[in-house]
Structure formats: structure tokens, C-alpha cells
Amino acid sequence: MKASELRDKDVAGLNQELSELLKAQFGLRMQKATQQLQNTSQLKKVRRDIARVRTVLGQKGNQK
């Protein structure tokens, strides 16, 4: 997801997105641990999406 798309969302939507991404990251880590994960680049993509969401949340918090 692009940062510009995230900036259009409200704080509640961003928190929901962050929660979903964290759950996805947990699932991917479990798949990696049990050697069921085929595409390991998914971990990197999810980790960076989490960072984007947290960055936008921080920016919205500083605006107030």
C-alpha cells in the first residue's frame, strides 16, 4: 500500500490496517518457522507496510 493512500485514511482506519498487517506478519513468521513459506519476500513487504502505517500514524499525531 502506498503512503499517499494511507494519508487519506483516518486514524481508526490506520489502526485497523496496522492490526491486520501485524496478524499477517505473525502468520508469515509461523509459516517460515515451519518451513511452509514459499515466497519469503512477503515478510519484507509486510514489514515495510507496517512501517509505512506507523509513520503516517505518527505524522497524524504530530499534526494535532
Swiss-Prot record:
It comes from the Bacteria. One of its GO terms (cellular component) is cytosolic large ribosomal subunit. GO terms for biological process: translation. One of its GO terms (molecular function) is structural constituent of ribosome. InterPro entries: Ribosomal_protein_uL29, Ribosomal_uL29, Ribosomal_uL29_CS, Ribosomal_uL29_sf. Keywords: Ribonucleoprotein, Ribosomal protein. The keyword Transcription regulation does not apply. Belongs to the universal ribosomal protein uL29 family. This is Large ribosomal subunit protein uL29.
